[in-house]
């Protein structure tokens, strides 16, 4: 497994792979890898000849400096996991390598609408940072496919739109959420939880599933469903942050013509902001 930290060396390897006619898959990550990331890697391996995993804690997508400072950097452990998975290439650049003149004056990519709605409304600049680094990685790696987790539902929708709008010839693969046996979605943020909070955390998925059951049963008073769900989260020990029920295909409000709904839930548990989602077919 090659570990590359600089742009010139990465370009050299990508040119070689292209000359050999290899089909390349990219799995962009910020490191602190868990089994959910490994599921992305496995999907990439099944679809391509060569798998490139990027590990880069992107400062442009953090709206709070304290979150950037405390994000775990576990490069050695991450590379050991990826080597066992027989990943071909790890791209682990420094911030200076990606943003040589800092982030303030760096050219950015913005996806109108999707960048500022829902999750983007409470995290200004976050999705602009995501779309900028992902587009840069696409230009550098030139993958045939790229794999992203469906847990970050809005992020996946944003990347799909960016790829369509910018004409990237890349297949975007959404990989289903990987969950623990108790239903908790695997996430790097789970590492912030105390032992006691780990016992509470699965309650998020229980509330999410309760909302889904109501929608499938034909309930359509969305305001009431959301209000009850928020109350249930707070009673379980969370601080409900945002609960949305949207059209799964547009992320706009559910209408009479909506065929699928996506339930988006965000809640604080201690210092960890947990997110989850579930898609429901509407009768």
From Swiss-Prot:
Name under which the protein is recorded: Pantothenate synthetase
BP GO annotations: pantothenate biosynthetic process
A Pfam match: Pantoate_ligase
Record field: catalytic activity: (R)-pantoate + beta-alanine + ATP = (R)-pantothenate + AMP + diphosphate + H(+)
Keyword Cytoplasm: yes
Organism expressing this protein natively: Shigella dysenteriae serotype 1 (strain Sd197)
GO CC, any one term: cytosol
E.C. numbers: 6.3.2.1
